[in-house]
Amino acid sequence: MWPNSNLNAVLLILAVLACPTSSQHVPLAMANSTSNQVPTDPGFMPLQQSPGSVFFVHHNQQNAMQLRHSMEGKLRNIRNTELRVAKIQEIFDSMHFSSAKGASNTRQASSNDSNVVNPQLQRDLQLFSERLSKKIQKATYVVLELRELLRYNLTKVWQYSYDDEDDESESEMDLEMELEDLHARNTASPTDEHVQLYLNTQIESCQPDYETDLEYGSSSTQSIHYNRQQIQILNYLKSDDARATFLNENNARSLAVNGYISNQLVLLKRRLSRSDAENSNSKPISGNHFKHIYFLSNSDGASASLHFRQLYVSAIKQKFVLFLIDVGSALSAELFDLSKSFVHEMLQLLEDTDKVSLVTVASEANFMSLEAFPAEAGHGIYSATRAHKEEIISFINSLSRAQAFTNHSLGFEYSFELLHRLQQSGMINTAEQPVEFVYITRGLLTNLSDAMAVLRVVADGQRRLRAPVIINTCAVVLDEKRIMYEKQFLNDVASQNYTKYEIDVASWWPSGQEASELVGRFYVLSKMHAETSLPQTSSRIFGPLFQERYLSDTLEVHPPVVDADSGDVLVSITHAVPPYGVVGVNLYLSDLLEDLLNYPSTTSSAKQGLGYAFLLDRSTGNTLAHPAFPRPLIQRETSYPVNIAYLENATDFSSHIRDRLLREESGNVTTDVYVGRQRLQRTYYWQSVLGFYVLCLVSSGGDTLRNVSSTQRYNLKDTVSNYEPGYYGESMDLLYHRLDLNQGGSAPPKTCRYFRQVATMDAPTLFLSAAAFESPFGFLHNNRPRTQLRHVESIMAYLRDSSGLLANMGLRPSIRHEVGVLYQAMQQLRRRHQDARGSLRSHVIRRYIASVSGVLQLYPGCLLSSSYDPTRRPWFRQAIAQPGKIVSTAPYLDAGGAGYIITIAHTIFEGKAHALHSAQQDRPVAVVALDVPYAFYYRLILEGTPICQLPHIKCLLFEHEGYLLAHPSMLQPATLTKNQRRPHEHLTHKESYLANDMLNHGQLVRKLGCASYQNRTLQRYYAFNTSLSSILGNVVHGERTKYAIALIRGSNLFAAVLNSSCDGGAFCPCSTIDRECLNCKRMDQTDCECPCECPMVGDSSSPSSLMYFANYTRQFPYCPPPSEHFIALPPTTQLLSTLPNCPGSAGICETYSTQRECLGVMGCEWCQLDVDGNSFSTSFCSSQASCFNGVLASLTPYGELDEMELLAAHNPQREQHAYSAFGPLGGAIVVLVMVIGFAIYCYRHNLDAQTQEHFYVDSVQEENYGLPLSRFNFDDCKAHDEPPLGGGYDHASAQRQLMHAADISPYHVSSGSSYRRPPNGESDHGYSTMTPHEDSSDQQCFTLAEPLLLHDKRHSKSDTMSISTSISSPTNRQQSSSQPNTHPYLSNQPTSKTERYKQVQATPSPCRGTPAGGSVYGQTTLPLEGDKTRPHYILAPVTVHRHMETAES
């Protein structure tokens, strides 16, 4: 910076010459359109300030300038000294290093500028489509072979014997020869023999066995015998099926067929594995493309996991499911929950093309009407899309039982009336469409003669339909032994036994149709076996519809789903084989997309118009891969289907280009796209892949339109040093990151414990992400532990080979050169890390450098997860998005165990001989970074700016989105009730007044939004102007809080100084439960709110959905995929507790005596509280693991304390390796306390059981009126606001509140807590920032006025045997239950889906009425008469003891 003598002179000149400038435009993401910018009031004029007026007029802005000056100097020192940016840039310039990815993007841009077809891009498209076609063809061949196997061979298998073990070798022949031979002998279609066969669902996992070699020998034989034994057991257990008998020759026949299918699946798995093994010889990294091969049997309804049951049911096309649900009083609470769970199971099996309707019946019947979809609600039928199913589930959860018995006849009458109306309107066709009628009931009849009336109603309803439908009945019971009459009645309904009741059906019965064709199935849903019976019944109930006329006769490629067991994203290819079942294979989505996921572009470059790729489902236009999507590897739940029209904002894409993509086999088209204020030309190249998918590569021009006015020179030397030319060879001291493997060499590296990582200080480690390999999928899924060591040794030998004789082990061609260049840069970082004179040696956790190709080197060397990708981390993305600046991330949790950390990063540009680099022109090829503790920046503030230590002065640092990096609260301990430290603490969380006022500065910050279509949300966030040149202060004058904000030049950080004696007044509404915005109908620039999200309301199946979501596309850009903040480390065989601590990582915290010295030191925390929240008389510096967040022995986000950390927590002044007898003694004490506590619990439990008849608990909410709890039945009497049919009262919640009253402040409970606000209590609507302090006395006053809810068994009898009432003043009167509580500050109340249906259906309960005035029984309300002036009333709690009551009462 300038010398002090010249500083004042320069500022004087600026004060004279400066003039007010116009509001500057905030540089936003380039994909934002002008419609996304929130306009400000035209009459509003922000405060215009010149640098001179800032310096001389406002003293607070002088403090901001001082803070900015200090931080700029420290960041400059970090960039040059700690990150060694200048030196590393010299290395890249001397070696003329450039990235192949960047070169390809340049070629695309230059080609498109001249409107010439890009030959390189077309070659890539051809190559990618061929690879994808081969993978899908291989899968389709397997599926077709399985189909032929079942279609022509099963009916003949029982004639052959498979018990001869000598024939095992003959079955090794190729499957094609066997199929041809059997097909020649039998070309007839399947016969009726399948009726006598009971086939089992069989699933073979194609995952390689990590513990054994690929030789199958005896292991496969044992597997076959095991499968046969399992088949026999399953067949024995399935004796309840009425269609097959296993006590005759059919049992042996079924066993033979099941054994044959199992053998063929094993042989097919062997052949696929052998094929992959042969491919791996030619390609060192070759993936196994199959997850499962399977046969889903129609006999058992695909009794497997949810995903397989969905595949089985999806074979039945265009289904219509009608639910008739009994909600009468015969159902207990448990049975009613069982009914809801069964409907939920069935809904999960339906796909988007299916239809659903629902009718509830008790003494009255009602159709399901969803408010969120009024168009469909008018007809009572809904498509089974994900949005509809979620709303239906919410509706079902809101149902409650009625107080009257069930009128079964009325339920069937309403159901058939609905079917007739839908048939007349053409929405269903019972003659051509599969209809599933399911009646879920207790089956209790008021009179045995009611069964005849029900069958007459059914017969009359069937008569009005074009074709009769099959009815399935489900009895929900607690015990199957006491349902004799109910079982007979429901069995008659399912079988439509009209003959038994002499009902004439000749007038409508189809001619030539057998009675068995209308026979449905009767199921028993028992509470005792709910975990197994519900899933199995939900899929088996579709068995009668598994007919050839309802099934598809082509291959089906299903949308990707996340496997609940493994977490993999799978794509299934299936084929129906009537009448046996479904055959198919599961493929990895990451395998199909490996070329597209690592296509040379990042999300930021895709948004800026550079090349990218996407993959579409040709039948639906839904997207499988796009730069807006995260990697399948980190996807945790199945996303909503996203049409490509939602993501592409090019001109004429939705109206013209999209149709061409889905219709034409191949082609290209060029159109215009507006990115911000720029007009670019975007070209789409596409190719159809076997008719299933459409692969599209996109390139955009317009790089010449960028502003290239400024250049920045980072290398101050005119001459470039000649670094060591031999960066290959054995002298390269570099280790592969797999430190858990013995990598050979002269001496194995010395491993140690670095926080929670296995690390080494001997050398830096090399990590190669999946993008560095030719087959990224093979790298991620072929990591067999036994072969991994050999693979690691081969990679390192190839990288060190200077002769060029060793073969490439599957790496991309440019990786070897990048490793050598990055190694030279790492030597600079390693020497700086080991320098004992370094001023930041105790603060820097680790240093690393990563290339855009996914090569990472770090020191100290650490073990990383194989799924780690440095190019997708937030520090890498932010540095690439802001090249030439030193970028800092918001605090996040370190996977290595260092707690909350901040990453400081800087880009390295491609090498140039003249060493001149421009942030606008040059391409970044690498990012160098280091990690520091989260409090590091606040330590820098205290060291460089003494003014920040004064009272009423706050100094803050926040990054370009408003997340705090430094705040005075970092000096205070974090607890659940005070100073909660979030991983991402935003400015609006901590400084509400500053956030409210700074939103008036249009040239400082914009409130923006983006669309996340995968979870159907609109994300709101803040974007700060990183080109700000002035210092901004208060817009509203006269406020008690004065502030000044300035940009720290050359970075993405902003400095703020607040001078205030009282921070009261302003607040920003933030939800304490989730991220949902409190007002989704309004988004104004000056409305302060925390970063939040709003749901998108819409249905992807409606005809107008495309235009509906396209409207979002025109207004908001798509959100980038979430950054991969935390990726857990892989488990190792080495125990961390047995490893010695790495030098410098432990044992130094006790040497710091003050908080200032302890602040920001890695692995250290200033310990101020014990685990009970009590302050220490003398605080001390301790290890972070033992005093996380300043609380001794508190739990960390990593889990429980291990033995060494627990020892350190109870002995903070003792080193961890010192011996202490606390372990054995403490263990004995804990065991003794547990034994005594258990004995006391047993004694009190028995005592409470004896005196339970005398204990009463009163609750105004539940109105038990003093009944003993042992005699109070929650199922017989309900709350006064419960509806008879479709109400909104939760019995489980009511019972919990009666026994455990919630007396917790909602403002002092973390968002992750299990606390839930009482249903009739006042809601705070998430205004957490309004009460930053402890509970006030006002709340205690209100507590006195509320009824007493006792939940502690240790109360005295005089307390528990009493009724608590209150005399209420007019201002303290409770609201009527029919009117929900409203908040005066909100125009629209954020209610959940369940609560919405509760409010609509709320009616008084017939159990016990409420007074006409709406008052609650047990509450005394003083009367009000007109407007006459009344004297003041006294508010006092009154306790009436039951010992005072008379016998008559």
UniProtKB/Swiss-Prot annotation:
Q: Ranges of Low complexity compositional bias?
A: 1359-1369
Question: Which taxonomic lineage is given here?
Answer: Eukaryota, Metazoa, Ecdysozoa, Arthropoda, Hexapoda
Annotated signal peptide: 1-23
Could you tell me the superkingdom of the organism this chain comes from?
A: Eukaryota
Q: What membrane topology does the annotation report for this chain?
A: Single-pass type I membrane protein
Domain VWFA per the UniProt entry, residue ranges: 320-541
Residue ranges of the region described as Disordered? 1307-1339, 1352-1416
Q: What is this protein called?
A: VWFA and cache domain-containing protein CG16868
> Would you list which residues are glycosylated?
N32, N112, N153, N407, N447, N497, N649, N668, N707, N1015, N1025, N1059, N1111
Instruction: Kindly list the residue ranges recorded as spanning the membrane.
Output: 1221-1241
What is the species of this protein? Drosophila melanogaster
Q: Which residues form the Cache domain?
A: 557-639, 889-934
